[in-house]
Amino acid sequence: GAAAMRYTEARLSKLAEEMLRDIEKDTVDMQLNFDDSLKEPVVLPCRFPNLLVNGASGIAVGMATNMPTHNLGEVIDGCVAYVKNAVERIQNPEVEPITVAELMEHIKAPDFPTGGTIYGYQGVRDAYETGRGRIIIRSKAEIETEDNGRERIVIGELPYGVVKSDLVKNIADLVNDKKIEGISGISDQSKRDVRVIIEIKRDANAQVVLNKLYKYTALQSSFSVNSIALVKGRPMLLNLHDMVANFIEHRMDVVIRRTKYDLRKAEERAHILEGLIIAVDNIDEVVRIIRASRTPAEAQSNLEVRFGLDNLQSKAIVDMRLSQLTGLRIEELKQEYAKLQELIQYLNELLNNETKRYEVIENELIEIKEKYADERRTRIIKMATEFNPEDMYADDDMVITISHLGYIKRTPLTEFRQQGRGGVGAKASAARDEDFIEYVHQANMHSTMMFFTEQGRLYWIKVYDIPEGNRQSKGRALQNMINIQKGDKVCAFIHVKNLNDQEYVDNHYLIFATKDGLMKKTTLESYSRPRA
């Protein structure tokens, strides 16, 4: 069963108290709690849109919700813009309702408490326009150069929901499994703030290592938005406009109910004051009647008959001690009564004027912003690009070797060091029966290899897709990489630095010559669109 309520405690922050403000004024409906012993609110009055600001995550039967957190100040700015638009539409019905795009000028993107960077804006746009979207979040990572010239990656913020200890372990496992190379050490120097140091080897490229960390670890993760919430008891998928509109509608209902409550209390107090003013104006006679009466009920009845009071007024007089009653000052009572009349007039105007109610909602939102808003923590990179495989590899010089039997590999040029006089050379591959090196070619890691076969076919391979091997390794069968047809064989190949360089491919040519002496010259552009 449910735990006893006495075991459930919470220390509320100042902002959390704003969620409960005016709950005592009959602003929301109440329902019985789990054991029907107490009543609890169906929803909180909440002076700010908590669902947007703090987000939500949960699973129910057949559905789930996952809403990101937002910056309080930005959300309130969006709500104020919605309110201003609503007022304009009251004054001029031809004004169009505020759009999601216009709200996004204020509510720019989710803002996570752990900071990080939203990488790319399409997911945010999808989430705000449709209620569903996939938002990419990157950690804050900076490359620093130490005094000794070595580089290191400093991680200062993590994507929302990422557990730091799990991340560090994952990176260590990838290094041990050789899936990420170039890392010499990892240290967690975090105290109050996150600070994880990744030491980079001298011969490694820190940017390439960081790109691999983004790809293979939670340094880059995604937040899948699914904005489902209960609206009048029914689950609905909400876009940004829907969420803001429902909040403002809720606040309008709260303001109306609070105003009616305040009006009722003000009228009740004014009614009592009318009786007290009559009593003080006739204080001697009132005291005489009370003293002459045998019971409070008799005193009430006598006062009602003599001064035309009703039961509430006479009871208020009789319930006061005579010392209190005689101490009342007529001017103070009249001043309080006059102020109450002004309040009653204002509250009635508020109930009868929708524009004034919107003004109240706007002012209360601005008050919350001035008290509690802070700076955005999560940065936004709108024009982010998808991962380019080239980002995973440094553009190093490579030696490409193809054997007589069709085995291919790439080897870093640095393995073929310069030798002095009398050197015996360096083997590009280990000798094997019936096989030998037939082609040796130098290319950069980001270059594209173009393979031409005896049957006139062309195949493309990026250099980084060619398996790396040392000088003794065999390599991989080229036929398994480019699916050469049976009986066909590579007869020539070249490498091109960048097939996307239009000026280059338009002004360079390939010349073909056949065994029968035929030749042709074709622009490189004709071969610059690789097919899978």
Regions found by a protein language model. Name each.
Residues A16-F48:
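Conserved mixed alpha/beta core segments that line enzyme active sites in large multi-domain catalysts
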